[in-house]
Regions:
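Rossmann-fold cofactor-recognition segment
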Residues: 1-7
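Short-chain dehydrogenase/reductase
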Residues: 13, 60, 113, 159-162
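Conserved hydrophobic beta-strands of the Rossmann-like cofactor-binding core
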Residues: 19, 23-24
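Catalytic loop of short-chain dehydrogenase/reductase
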Residues: 29-30, 36-49, 65, 69-122
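PG/GG-rich flexible active-site loop of Rossmann-like NAD(P)H-dependent oxidoreductases
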Residues: 82-84, 129-136
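Short, small/polar-rich loop/turn modules that mediate ligand/substrate recognition or access, typified
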Residues: 126
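C-terminal helical subdomain
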Residues: 129, 137, 141-169
Length: 169
C-alpha cells in the first residue's frame, strides 16, 4: 500500500475482519545520494518525513478508525525507527552531519511514536519504539562499505530482535 495515502492504507486492510493484537509499523525510505546542505533535494526531504514519520501514524489512525485495534489490553504496536533519529547518536557515531531527511524523519518518528503511546494508553493499547539494529538491506546499501565495521546484521536478525521485544511488551 502507499503509506502516504489513507485510502490506500484502508484498502490494504479491507479484508481484515477482526481486530488485531500486534501491529509492526515499519516504514522506511532513504534517498540514495549523500545529502548535504549543498546537495539536498527538498522534495526528497519531505518525502522521507512523510513516509517515515507521518506514514506510520496514518496506518494506526486507519486501523483505529476501522475498529481493527484490540482495546482489551492485548494490542501491541511496534513502531520501528532507528538510532539515526537520536541526536546523541549523531554526535558520537557520525559528527560530520549529512543525510538530513532520513535522520530528521526518524527523529520525528521517535517523537510521534512517544506521543502515540501516551494517547493510546487510555485505550489500553501499548506502543513501543524499537530499533532493530543496523540491518543489511537495499535501503542501507549506500553504506555497504561500513556494514561489517558497524556490526550490520541480516534483516532476519533484525526481525527476530523486533519479535523478541514485542514478546516482552
Amino acid at each position: 500500500c502507499e503509506i502516504t495515502d489513507e485510502k490506500s492504507i484502508a484498502n490494504a486492510f479491507k479484508e481484515i475482519t477482526e481486530p488485531v493484537d500486534i501491529v509492526i509499523n515499519n516504514a522506511g525510505y532513504f534517498y540514495e545520494p549523500l545529502e548535504t546542505l549543498d546537495s539536498m533535494n527538498f522534495e526528497e526531504e519531505l518525502q522521507m518525513i512523510d513516509i517515515c514519520a507521518v506514514g506510520p501514524l496514518r496506518v494506526v489512525k486507519v486501523l483505529r478508525d476501522m475498529k481493527l485495534l484490540k482495546t482489551d489490553g492485548t494490542c501491541k504496536i511496534a513502531m520501528i525507527t532507528s538510532q539515526g533519529g537520536s541526536i546523541s547518536w549523531r554526535e558520537v557515531q557520525n559528527p560530520d552531519g549529512h543525510d538530513y531527511g532520513h535522520h530528521m524523519s526518524k527523529a520525528a518518528a521517535n517523537m510521534g511514536s512517544k506521543l502515540l503511546a501516551q494517547e493510546l494508553k487510555k485505550e489500553k493499547i501499548a506502543v513501543q519504539i524499537l530499533h532493530p539494529g543496523f540491518n543489511k538491506t537495499g535501503m542501507t546499501q549506500k553504506y555497504e562499505k561500513i556494514w561489517e565495521i558497524e556490526g550490520a546484521v541480516d534483516a532476519s536478525v533484525g526481525a527476530k530482535r523486533v519479535m523478541h521485544e514485542i514478546s516482552l511488551m
